[in-house]
């Protein structure tokens, strides 16, 4: 990878992916794009930026051609809870954008990455140690998009030889950008509210286990997969990824080691709870570890300490 275009660069993953790629490959070699201009204080302002609507294929191709890109990381998407509220928009953006990105990758012979998700699984999937290859019958529009996306990426690799690669992300936890529209977002919000208010009301019920990962591990995984030898990638599209699995009470216990008075109560959102209930409790990541060396660094305790310290600094500097 030498010249990288990233769509959805102002999103939760995109923002940090842009920064890490610029750190490794150089600021001027990573072009950030999104549907809107960044705020003045956005961290992505440290390098080139273009406004891009991913549903406009001609505009996407023009940006890739003008930048002389060799890699396209397609991160633009409507997330799970938001997609469920507006399924037609989700299909148009998530699938239309992906098709345009894949066609762009085919036309310009690009290395290609796009994220899938644990949302690609459903009620009929084994919930414990969910295998890499298993039943995928999601009950949400977001999940349907992700399953279709995995199949499309594999199709473009098999049919056209496009170097497609993707991972099934769990919930991703970060202090850099506050989340929006995801089912696992409670696991980010809880840290911000612990620092700001000393309490949190969870929309996800007690004893609801979901796979999670600290954002630094997620970004490192993308780059490690993209730098891996293509010949060693057997699975290629939709690698299971996770660093930990927990439920709300376990985060509370870790936060209370730093904030003993922290209080947690519940006001369950039936839409997001139903989505969470359809997902695995924990997934098998052995294929990712074996084929390209996935090895996350952070567990719940380490992540909690980092999150609280970082948010405390943010709040003090406001």
From Swiss-Prot:
A GO biological process held by the record: threonine catabolic process
Domain of life: Bacteria
InterPro entries given in the database record: Epimerase_deHydtase, NAD(P)-bd_dom_sf, NAD(P)_epim/dehydratase
MF terms (GO), sorted A to Z: L-threonine 3-dehydrogenase activity
CDD domains noted in UniProt: TDH_SDR_e (cd05272)
A UniProt-annotated Pfam family: Epimerase
Family under the similarity heading: Belongs to the NAD(P)-dependent epimerase/dehydratase family.
Protein name per Swiss-Prot or TrEMBL: Uncharacterized epimerase/dehydratase SH2450
Organism: Staphylococcus haemolyticus (strain JCSC1435)
């Amino acid at each position: 990878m030498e010249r990288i275009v990233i769509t959805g660069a102002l999103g939760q993953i995109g923002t940090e992916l842009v920064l890490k790629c610029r750190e490794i490959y150089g600021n001027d070699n990573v072009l950030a794009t999104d549907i809107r201009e960044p705020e003045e204080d956005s961290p992505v302002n440290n390098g080139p930026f273009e406004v891009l609507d991913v549903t406009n294929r001609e505009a996407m191709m023009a940006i890739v051609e003008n930048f002389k890109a060799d890699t396209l990381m397609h991160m633009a998407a409507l997330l799970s809870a938001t997609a469920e509220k507006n399924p037609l928009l989700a299909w148009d953006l998530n699938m239309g954008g992906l098709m345009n990105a894949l066609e762009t990758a085919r036309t310009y012979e690009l290395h290609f990455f796009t994220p899938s998700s644990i949302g690609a699984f459903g009620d009929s999937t084994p919930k414990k140690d969910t295998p890499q290859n298993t039943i995928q019958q999601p009950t949400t529009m977001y999940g349907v998009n992700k399953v279709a996306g995995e199949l499309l990426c594999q199709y473009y690799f098999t049919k056209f030889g496009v170097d497609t690669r993707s991972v099934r992300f769990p919930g991703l936890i970060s202090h850099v950008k506050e989340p929006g529209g995801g089912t696992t977002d409670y696991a980010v919000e809880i840290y911000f509210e612990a620092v700001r208010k000393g309490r949190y009301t969870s929309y996800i019920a007690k004893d609801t286990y979901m796979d999670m990962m600290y954002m630094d591990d997620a970004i490192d995984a993308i780059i490690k997969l993209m730098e891996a030898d293509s010949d060693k990638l057997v699975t290629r599209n939709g690698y299971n990824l996770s660093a930990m699995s927990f439920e709300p009470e376990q985060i509370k216990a870790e936060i209370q080691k730093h904030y003993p008075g922290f209080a947690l109560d519940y006001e369950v959102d039936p839409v997001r709870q139903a989505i969470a209930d359809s997902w695995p409790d924990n997934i098998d990541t052995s294929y990712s570890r074996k084929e390209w060396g996935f090895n996350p660094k952070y567990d719940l305790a380490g992540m909690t300490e980092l999150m609280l310290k970082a948010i405390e600094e943010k709040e003090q500097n406001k």
